[in-house]
Amino acid sequence: MAKKTNKFLRVNTEGGYFGLGRGIDFQNVLNRLAIIIVLLSSVAATMWKSFAGATSEASAYFGLNTAAAVLFAWLIAQELDPDRKLGGVIAAIVAIVFAFLLGVGNVMPLLWLLFILRLLNRTSGAIHKIGDNILLLLLAFWLGKEGQWLYPVFTGIAYILESRLPRGYFRSLYMGGFAFALVALAEVSREPVTISINNIYLMAVVFVLLLPAISMALYTQFKGDYDNVRISPRRLQAAQGSFIVITFAVAWFHGDAEALNMSPAWAGAIGVGMSLLAAALQNAFYKKKI
């Protein structure tokens, strides 16, 4: 009798140690424009801080952090609405405005969020591999030790949700168990948590603008980078819904500091919503003209 093979073995080992990484298509005009905006934002932020009287080190640090925030806003917008590139460009511009008005926070939560979204929507066209899992668990552990205990909690929930979505990977359950174990190592801050009314207003705007994208996800035609297969609309909607729950929850339970960290992600959602709104207005104008 032939030896029974593991049907998950091929997809688990094929393609190296990372499956959630995605390349950038520099042939796309909007992608090139977004990269230019990222680079210019660093220069503009550095000069603005210098003219404000900051030291050269503080100015350079602010410039690099601003560029990182703009970059993640663009990347996260691509995960929330992979079919339309314009949303990412708008998100980058909104992120610059946020950086100048609100300041910049820690980019580690943004890196974690980016990989959580890719874990769920599978825009890369591949399942998570050992490298992705190590990165996500390390980020969850580090953020948990910083007092942000919700990150390992949401990491575990995301892995379990991934296993239940179409073409879910059964080993996600194991990773979810590891993530929940990290909750025991997380620090819980004893300081009172406050969140400003401005951040609550901002969350309301994000929620309203992202709702059309969740509806449009049913009609996605985006194909995974590696397998060139249309991604599951349910997976895309799961990522979008998780984005709302995660970003709102960490801001609510961890306060204004975490809301600042989430502001580039919210810029990504606003860019997606504004892109869809612009497309709807253009379509309505075209129909009226006909």
Residue ranges of model-derived segments:
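Generic multipass alpha-helical transmembrane bundles of integral membrane proteins
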Residues: 119, 125-249
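N-terminal topogenic module of multi-pass integral membrane proteins
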Residues: 1-131, 142, 238-290
